[in-house]
UniProtKB/Swiss-Prot annotation:
This is Glucose-6-phosphate 1-dehydrogenase. PANTHER family: GLUCOSE-6-PHOSPHATE 1-DEHYDROGENASE, GLUCOSE-6-PHOSPHATE 1-DEHYDROGENASE G6PD. It comes from the Eukaryota. Its main location: cytoplasm. The lineage of its organism: Eukaryota, Metazoa, Ecdysozoa, Arthropoda, Hexapoda. InterPro entries: G6P_DH, G6P_DH_NAD-bd, NAD(P)-bd_dom_sf. SUPFAM superfamilies: NAD(P)-binding Rossmann-fold domains (SSF51735). Its EC number is 1.1.1.49. It comes from Drosophila simulans. Cytosolic glucose-6-phosphate dehydrogenase that catalyzes the first and rate-limiting step of the oxidative branch within the pentose phosphate pathway/shunt, an alternative route to glycolysis for the dissimilation of carbohydrates and a major source of reducing power and metabolic intermediates for fatty acid and nucleic acid biosynthetic processes. The keyword Oxidoreductase applies. It is found in: Cytoplasm, Cytosol.
Amino acid sequence: LWWLYRDDLLPKPTKFCGYARSMLTTETLKEQCLPYMKVQPHEQNKYEEFWALNDYVSGRYDGRTSFEVLNQRLEMMENKNKANRIFYLALPPSVFEEVTVNIKQVCMSLCGWNRVIIEKPFGRDDASSQALSDHLAGLFNEDQLYRIDHYLG
């Protein structure tokens, strides 16, 4: 994301909000990411601008309450502006269903489009892959879904 931002390949004003179970802060994430970002000295100001657009929410994958907190943070970041939301799920397959239900029920943008990207093995076999596809079809339109499978990619 940093490289896309650095090269002005993202629409303005794109903002980023991470969500995971880990108890982290945005500052901690910034420190942990720095060795991998390949920031050149002349890019330091832009790098700081990039991190000013980032936020992080720690929460559970099960239950609605954490997703309500996430949605409140997203709304705060959007500041009542029209906003599109992309949910990039790099999660254990065992939590896909509960997380996608919570996203659908709590975190969808009401005044922009929504997309869900699912990255991971998409099921263990044909039957589990079909079950996940059926679950997602009950929540989202096909044009809202993107699937990235480590094994097929």
